[in-house]
Amino acid sequence: MVDTDNDDLKSSTGSIGDLYAQKSSPKGGKPFHILGLHLKSKGIFEAYEWSKWWEKADANRKKILAQATQIRVKFLDPFLTDSTTSSPLIVCGDINDGPGLDACEKRLFGSGVERLMRMIWKPQLCLGNALFDTLSAKDKEEVDFSSIYTTTFKDPIFNDTYQREWIDHILYSKNQISEWVTGGQIHSKMPDGTPIYTRYKHASDHFPISVDINT
């Protein structure tokens, strides 16, 4: 249970259990670890009275924040500060949350992915974001993430309008001297240019993300 918004009420993290980072030893490179995540969905796909809808939306977001906080405090910080485990670390997966301040995030003063990425009092433990690194200098300066999205869906609340969301991330530790994670890409098409969803009708509605890793 975690107090996500300083209201003296604690939100359940659900079942996180033990977390383990898988060690990978690439040929010709130094070992690094990978932690794959899939946090609570924030989607609501049923009709509710408006105040009830907001209640459910806020509850989902609080659970994501609680899960992200537990992972940051109970796994990431200990892992990155332990001399026996402080090798390069990738944290990736469907975080089900993006950076920025949408309506719910304004109400809760934060997002799950930002909670995973940083603890402002421990800047040396902050994680980089591979897709943010690909933004133009102007978009970085203005903190404009609108060009990045990893899934699209019909929003039943707004007459099935297609929404674009950035909820899948590849984060990386900054405990290396050189840049070791580069070339972030979102893949919406097959190598021959065919959209993935037209080739594979039952594929995930999330686009694959890739990076180049050089340890």
Task: Give the ranges of each region predicted by the language model.
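Structured beta-strand-rich core segments of catalytic domains in phosphoester-bond hydrolases
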Residues: 1-42
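Metal-dependent phosphoester-hydrolase catalytic domains
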Residues: 12-15, 23, 77-90, 95-215
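A solvent-exposed, charged loop/short amphipathic helix patch at secondary-structure junctions
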Residues: 42-62, 115-117
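A long, amphipathic alpha-helix that forms part
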Residues: 55-83
